[in-house]
Amino acid sequence: MPELPEVETSRRGIEPHLVGATILHAVVRNGRLRWPVSNEIHTLSDKPVLSVQRRAKYLLLELPDGWIIIHLGMSGSLRILSEELPAEKHDHVDLVMSNGKVLRYTDPRRFGAWLWTKELEGHNVLAHLGPEPLSEAFNAEYLKARCAKKKTPIKPWLMDNKLVVGVGNIYASESLFAAGIHPDRLASSLSEQECEILVKVIKAVLLRSIEQGGTTLKDFLQSDGKPGYFAQELQVYGRKGEPCRVCGTPIVASKHAQRATFYCRQCQK
């Protein structure tokens, strides 16, 4: 599933081609996504794009009279293409632009979403989200306070969007390794110093992944069709049985809330 770095990479890739251009019309080939494509998107016509923003894993296209909310789901991607390039089987939505480009949404598993809203504030998919991990609001004091009475393992708690947005399975595993914290540790057991370290490494890991264009494991591609390269730097995720790059101990895989977790028994306590 695309996580925050992949969505931010997509945002940065499509923004220069959309802002300042006008959506001439939309082509919805298959509107049966996680939720049905909003009716307003089917009928888009002559709408200039004012900005391309991101909140958590949602891309937000600002138009004069409302917002398009896009979620990439499990396998979705956005590409900027020339208008004449024919659509393929899993190309479900196009925005045809005035500059001769097309924003094409591809989603083999159809778990993504294309929604419309007049106002972002209070929309049900955005209303209960925690702070952005790269913002000043996500700091050691905040994390310590939110962990203080939490009797659940730290790994799934980091992946809870009510705590902090966009830290999915890959980056939770990588951040806990970088912080030296075992994923089975109860959130309430983290010290102030550990919270400070964890916040710093989460920010560093996410920023590094954004610089590398995200992590390509199976489905994710950047808006230009190229893969993300952070997968080449993964320390634990997807490396079950391989030697830890720090100490040589074989990487262990386990399950948390039905999600694979990877860690080093020696380096993480």
UniProtKB/Swiss-Prot annotation:
Keyword DNA repair: yes
Catalytic site: 2-3, 57, 259
Superkingdom of this protein's organism: Bacteria
MF-aspect GO terms: 8-oxo-7,8-dihydroguanine DNA N-glycosylase activity; class I DNA-(apurinic or apyrimidinic site) endonuclease activity; damaged DNA binding; zinc ion binding
Entry keyword set: DNA damage, DNA repair, DNA-binding, Glycosidase, Hydrolase, Lyase, Metal-binding, Multifunctional enzyme, Zinc, Zinc-finger
ZnF start-end (FPG-type): 235-269
The record's free-text note on cofactor binding: Binds 1 zinc ion per subunit.
Cofactor: Zn(2+)
GO BP annotation list: base-excision repair
EC annotation from Swiss-Prot or TrEMBL: 3.2.2.23, 4.2.99.18
Reaction catalyzed: Hydrolysis of DNA containing ring-opened 7-methylguanine residues, releasing 2,6-diamino-4-hydroxy-5-(N-methyl)formamidopyrimidine; 2'-deoxyribonucleotide-(2'-deoxyribose 5'-phosphate)-2'-deoxyribonucleotide-DNA = a 3'-end 2'-deoxyribonucleotide-(2,3-dehydro-2,3-deoxyribose 5'-phosphate)-DNA + a 5'-end 5'-phospho-2'-deoxyribonucleoside-DNA + H(+)
Keyword NAD: no
Function description: Involved in base excision repair of DNA damaged by oxidation or by mutagenic agents. Acts as a DNA glycosylase that recognizes and removes damaged bases. Has a preference for oxidized purines, such as 7,8-dihydro-8-oxoguanine (8-oxoG). Has AP (apurinic/apyrimidinic) lyase activity and introduces nicks in the DNA strand. Cleaves the DNA backbone by beta-delta elimination to generate a single-strand break at the site of the removed base with both 3'- and 5'-phosphates.
Stated family: Belongs to the FPG family.
Subunit structure: Monomer.
Name of the protein described by the UniProt record: Formamidopyrimidine-DNA glycosylase
Species the sequence originates in: Enterobacter sp. (strain 638)
